[in-house]
Amino acid sequence: MTPDLAPDPLEPAKPLGGLTGPQINLFNAGIAEFNKRDEVKADGLGPRMNLDSCASCHAHPDVGGTSPPDLNPQFDFYEKNLQKTNRLPRFITKAGPVREARFKLNPDGRTPDGGVHSIFIITGLKDADGCVLQQPDFARQLRRKNVIFRIPTPVFGAGLIEQIPDQVILDNHATKRGNAYGIRGRVNIINAGHALTARENRNGNDGTIARFGWKAQNKSLLVFAGEAYNVEMGISNELFQTEREEDPKCQFKPTPNDTTKPDQTGLDVLSDIEKFSAFMRFLAPPTPSQAEPGGADSISRGKKLFVKTGCALCHAPSLRTGTSTVAALSAKEVDLYSDLALHDMGDWLADGISQGQATSREFRTAPLWGLGQRIFFLHDGRTRDLKRAIQEHRSPGSEANRVVRQFFNRLTQSQQQDVLNFLRSL
């Protein structure tokens, strides 16, 4: 079998069809900001960060995707800018993936941490008297088995996902009750202050169904953008106003770095995170291939087997958006292959991190559209092998255990290849 076969990229990142001229202009302003490399003085980069631009993480197969292969932007960022002042942790390699590191427990070894510990630091600033920064001791934490990783989630079609009403998600969930596969699941409802770490940070989650991030920890694209800007690049903003560095001697600016600019005109009024969210909101989903890999007949058979084996109970083929003021997002079928709910994935995939109502073993069903171009699989990018990623779902205690063990694994080799071809066509 060839589980790692993917067709050539079908098309670059593009806006949704049906957008108006002003909406296209907003999309273009957003993608420009998404691609921009932020700087320390001009933008407030750091003093702790993982990279210096959104597009560095979300790069494959194009802007808005996930971790690129072959040349890890974190490795490149270190070599070009930070070799004299930073150590490169052994889990950041040239071949990738891009990684975010979180510690499961605090230094006392008992209480939960769960927060992001940025890989790189900015040092040597002339106006930073008294500020002494050190990188986390990743080697020690790795020995303690206290480090877990996350890779970037793709944001293709994210505006369509944002427009799916809560009730549609709940109604779809209700159809699973009493199924013979052991699939349960639940939605993640998060209130302000509990999506990032245990620390209070009034970030806009308001008790509606959250749906973005590996654990569905963010309710909206604006919250998703604000958190990422703060956590991955150290840039405070109107939603996440607290610097990632807690030492008061390293608090260089008492107000957020990124804000709305009422003294400007046109789109320049908008904050960076508003532009990021607009780009993601208007970014089109991938177009599936009708014939690659394996041919149209194989893909068609694989799609039917995907449903028959129970995979589609979590990876729901389609949900529908509600009414939107943006016609391109209103009343659309969204072929995302996700129910946007949390599911218990068992011990093999558990990461020891809770976010909102999501426990250490629960993850949002990852949308499968765009899978044909994905290189790294699962939340931590542990494998490039699609079939292994499927097998990881049969972890003891996983809701998907029976689906994989009793249904997928009993397919013939030819049938399994059809399923893989279908997945790689998405």
Write out the residue ranges for each language-model feature.
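Periplasmic c-type cytochrome electron-transfer domains
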Residues: M1-L426
